[in-house]
Amino acid sequence: MIDARFGHVNVIAKDWQKLADFYEAVFGMQIVPPLRDYRGPDLEAGTGIEGAALRGAHLRLPGLGPDGPTLEIYQYESGPAALPAAANRPGYQHIAFAVPDVPAAREAVFSAGGRKVGSIVTATTADGRRVTWTYVTDPEGNIIELQDWAERDE
């Protein structure tokens, strides 16, 4: 087993600044300086993309402290069209946030340009815990899960 620590999750955006603004406004994330502007042979070699050039930022994930993992939002200067988000598409699917009030958090997402994917659901899990959750999207269609876990039913 390797010695590892979680570092970041990457989202490729159509407009990195607008997407970063959304995550700052809705979830209170903060940009971790410096802003990134990468291009050249090292980026091309590492990504396997000829002529790769990107800009963006890392945003501190909420509730994890100054040395915690980040959400990395980058925008390539050119690239293929995005695939539509779908809850059953193979690969990385969504990012989840624990929130104290799912309906209020969902409204904050909508107010900042996000959209509805599904309904708000409350269910009891196999281990007896209750969770209220829903899927929404950010303004670029990336799926976000909002969840509120209750104590175990006694």
What positions do the PLM features span?
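Short, flexible turn/loop "capping" segments at secondary-structure junctions
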Residues: 1-3, 87-88
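Vicinal oxygen chelate
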Residues: 2, 11, 33-34, 71, ...
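Eukaryotic phosphotyrosine signaling hubs
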Residues: 6-8, 90-94
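Core segments of cupin and vicinal oxygen chelate
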Residues: 12-67, 104, 127
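Active-site-proximal beta-strand elements of phosphoester/diester hydrolases
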Residues: 23, 72-75
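A short, acidic/glycine-rich surface segment
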Residues: 40-45, 79-84, 154
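Amide-forming acyltransferase catalytic core, primarily the GNAT-like/NAT-type
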Residues: 58, 76-79
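Generic beta-structure capping elements
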Residues: 62, 74-76, 149
